[in-house]
């Protein structure tokens, strides 16, 4: 099983991009009122949630391999990443309720989607510091 964990660095970029694309698409809907972008957002968050599950599984496998040293940074990355994956699943599930027009449903979906994007950004940053070090951006 540890072999599949080695795919985490490859797979992790897909759900990040999909969640960010979903959030960007929904922002376009809010700003321009063009509902076609909502379809883009929903497709991306659903795909991002599915890929997030696969990526989280490979991340857990990778973290338990002898290649990775346990650290507080790893634990933060692990749990913020899990929260992001769970939030993505929540946003994807909430997107199915949007076929019935409701301002409340739209607000809850969008709030969950934007929180998901924030969690994914934080988890991605933490993962980057695990790979490149905390001083990567320092001159």
What annotation goes with each model-predicted range?
Residues 1-139:
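Polytopic transmembrane helical bundles with strong interfacial aromatic enrichment
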């Amino acid at each position: 099983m540890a072999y599949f964990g080695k795919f985490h660095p490859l797979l992790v970029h897909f759900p990040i991009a999909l969640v960010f694309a979903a959030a960007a698409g929904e922002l376009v809907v809010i700003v321009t009122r063009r509902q076609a972008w909502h379809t883009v957002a929903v497709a991306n968050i659903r795909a991002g949630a599915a890929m997030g599950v696969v990526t989280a599984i490979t991340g857990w496998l990778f973290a338990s391999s002898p290649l990775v040293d346990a650290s507080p940074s790893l634990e933060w990355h692990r749990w913020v990443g899990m929260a992001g994956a769970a939030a993505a699943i929540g946003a994807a599930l909430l997107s199915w309720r949007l076929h019935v027009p409701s301002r409340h449903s739209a607000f809850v979906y969008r709030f969950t989607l934007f929180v998901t994007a924030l969690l994914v950004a934080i988890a991605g940053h933490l993962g980057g510091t695990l790979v490149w070090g905390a001083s990567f951006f320092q001159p």
